[in-house]
């Protein structure tokens, strides 16, 4: 059996608890401010909804890339067959291994410096200019 601790917990008063809550509130505010001011916006924590949205988008992109590759291979097989029996035989022995990556679907993330380009200046009107 474990030995009891040397000193018992002291009962906190209402003032102590209020002071502790205000201290924790200030710390929480400072931490949130520090999180919001990170240099890279991708470093912030994701919410569950954002994670789920990215997961769904990634699965969709990879599925689309895989579907294109599967269709291409099946079309190749079907181009060689003429009769229904040949189709049945070809499909019976069909086994595919597909490798997909995000760059296959065209949905790969842009390079890090892609958003740092300068935008074109806004065009100005010549309404007040006399020719």
Curated annotation (Swiss-Prot):
Effect on the protein of changing residue 31 to A: Decreased homooligomerization, formation of DNA-induced phase separation and ability to inhibit host CGAS
Consequence of substituting residue 24 to A: Decreased homooligomerization, formation of DNA-induced phase separation and ability to inhibit host CGAS
Annotated effect of mutating residue 28 to A: Decreased homooligomerization, formation of DNA-induced phase separation and ability to inhibit host CGAS
A GO BP entry: symbiont-mediated suppression of host innate immune response
Classification via Pfam families: Herpes_BLRF2 (PF05812)
Low complexity biased stretches: 122-131
Outcome, altering residue 27 to A: Does not affect homooligomerization; does not affect ability to inhibit host CGAS
Keyword line: DNA-binding, Host cytoplasm, Host-virus interaction, Inhibition of host innate immune response by virus, Phosphoprotein, Viral immunoevasion, Virion, Virion tegument
Residues the record lists as Phosphoserine modifications: 123
Effect of mutating residue 97 to A: Decreased DNA-binding and ability to inhibit host CGAS
Effect of residue 87 to A: Does not affect DNA-binding; does not affect ability to inhibit host CGAS
Residue ranges that the Swiss-Prot or TrEMBL entry lists as coiled coil: none
Protein name: Tegument protein ORF52
Organism: Human herpesvirus 8 type P (isolate GK18) (HHV-8)
